[in-house]
């Protein structure tokens, strides 16, 4: 199967991200307006950032692709999205109470450097809300999707398991809480049908990911909190 370039596949995350489930996660995890400045990493076309700002959040974003930023402004007006190279965040220490990212963590080659920067810009006791695919379930899907055991690694270079997420975040001073968010939405069924066909939909009825144990969920919804200094 012909594969789109890695940068193209990453840019499509805004269209193919599980938007409905991401919103539910933020609500259930207790992210409320008035909690202080919020940074979205990987704003894409600005859909989530626009919603957060309309709901009263003091939110801004960063994005690696200038064309995506231009598209966000065409769709939603002059959103406060800065272009960054992805390695560093152009903000002062302790600038944000909250950081969020969706379908971004798995694309970052050096997740330790990423978490170091997130920790730096978060205020003491701040929170990082993120959604990222499960390493074990995603590898199976992507192998079938691309008909290759290695092609997906170019794009999803930093997939993590449940245990690996807990360990990596703990190394940077985070306490992690995983949320059980249903993912079998209309978008999810569309994706299964597109890439796996009717057999995939039939398999979905037998093995519904929403019924899997937390460590085997197709996507991890993580609330990572920095400990407050004593």
Where are these regions (language model features)?
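Generic C-terminal helix-cap and adjacent flexible tail
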Residues: 227-230
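Surface-exposed beta-strand edges and their flanking turn/coil or helix-capping segments
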Residues: 56, 65, 74, 95-97, ...
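A short His-aromatic
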Residues: 103-107
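S-adenosyl-L-methionine-dependent methyltransferase catalytic module, highlighting the catalytic core
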Residues: 3-21, 47, 109-117, 127-225
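Conserved N-terminal segment of class I S-adenosyl-L-methionine
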Residues: 1-92, 98-102, 115, 215-220
């Amino acid at each position: 199967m012909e594969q789109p370039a890695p940068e193209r596949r990453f840019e499509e995350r805004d269209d193919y991200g599980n938007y409905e489930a991401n919103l539910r996660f933020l609500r259930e995890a207790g992210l409320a307006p008035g909690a202080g400045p919020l940074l979205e990493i990987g704003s894409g076309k600005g859909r989530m950032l626009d919603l957060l700002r309309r709901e009263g959040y003091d939110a801004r974003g960063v994005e690696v692709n200038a064309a995506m930023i231009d598209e966000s402004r065409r769709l939603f007006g002059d959103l406060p999205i800065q272009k960054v190279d992805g390695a560093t965040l152009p903000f002062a220490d302790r600038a944000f109470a909250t950081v969020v990212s969706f379908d971004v963590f798995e694309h970052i080659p050096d997740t330790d450097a990423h978490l170091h920067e997130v920790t730096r810009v978060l205020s003491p006791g701040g929170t990082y809300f993120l959604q990222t695919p499960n390493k074990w379930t995603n590898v199976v899907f992507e192998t079938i999707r691309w008909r290759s055991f290695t092609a997906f690694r170019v794009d999803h270079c930093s997939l993590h398991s449940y245990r690996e997420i807990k360990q990596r975040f703990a190394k940077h001073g985070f306490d992690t809480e995983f949320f059980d968010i249903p993912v079998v939405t209309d978008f999810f069924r569309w994706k299964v049908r597109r890439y796996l066909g009717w057999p995939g939909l039939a398999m979905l009825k037998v093995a519904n990911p929403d019924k899997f144990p937390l460590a085997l969920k197709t996507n991890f919804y993580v609330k990572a909190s920095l400990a407050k200094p004593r």
